[in-house]
């Protein structure tokens, strides 16, 4: 619904650049607290999101850790240059590396509950989601990386 939601093309050559640019664009549009949420986290609730916005009043960064070592949510109340765009993603040390960088910058951080995000077929099982495919190869084509 174009009257209710604004849509924007993501800009950047990789995930980190796209996330960083999203924050830059939103702050340029005069938003004062911004939260990015991954679309592959089925257990996220409105209470978690509300808690994130609440904690941004007290902290520089909020992070929702994912069980696989990444994160499903990140929020800021001001842009932090190159926090997200100069790093690699898709490995189990993503969260730890980001938290190290946040600490090096002397930023305060609040961690939301750890949740599962869906990256591979086993993640569906862990989340209690069952999807039946006629052909097992259809999983990779339709859901997998």
Name every feature range the model reports, one short phrase each.
Residues 2-33, 91-94:
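Short phosphate-binding loop-to-helix
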Residues 96, 100-145:
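Conserved alpha/beta core of the MobA/IspD/sugar-nucleotide pyrophosphorylase nucleotidyltransferase superfamily
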Residues 35-37:
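Short aromatic-hydrophobic micro-motifs that form the base-stacking/packing surface
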Residues 80-101:
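Short, glycine-/small-residue-rich phosphate/pyrophosphate-handling segment
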Residues 44-69:
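Conserved donor-nucleotide/metal-binding helix-loop-beta segment in metal-dependent transferases, i.e.
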Residues 67-82, 89:
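Conserved catalytic core of nucleotide-sugar-dependent glycosyltransferases
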Residues 39-41:
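Short acidic donor-binding/metal-coordinating loop in glycosyltransferase active sites
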């Amino acid at each position: 619904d174009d009257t209710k939601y604004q849509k924007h093309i993501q800009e950047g050559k990789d995930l980190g650049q796209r996330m960083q640019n999203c924050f830059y664009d939103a702050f340029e549009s005069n938003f004062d607290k911004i939260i990015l949420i991954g679309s592959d986290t089925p257990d996220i609730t409105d209470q978690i999101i509300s808690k994130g916005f609440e904690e941004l009043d007290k902290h520089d960064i909020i992070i929702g850790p994912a069980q696989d070592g990444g994160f499903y949510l990140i929020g800021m109340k001001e842009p932090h240059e190159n926090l997200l765009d100069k790093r690699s993603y898709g490995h189990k040390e993503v969260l730890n590396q980001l938290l190290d960088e946040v600490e090096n910058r002397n930023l305060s951080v609040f961690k939301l509950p750890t949740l599962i995000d869906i990256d591979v077929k086993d993640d569906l099982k862990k989340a209690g989601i069952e999807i039946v495919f006629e052909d097992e190869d259809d999983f990779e084509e339709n859901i997998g990386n």
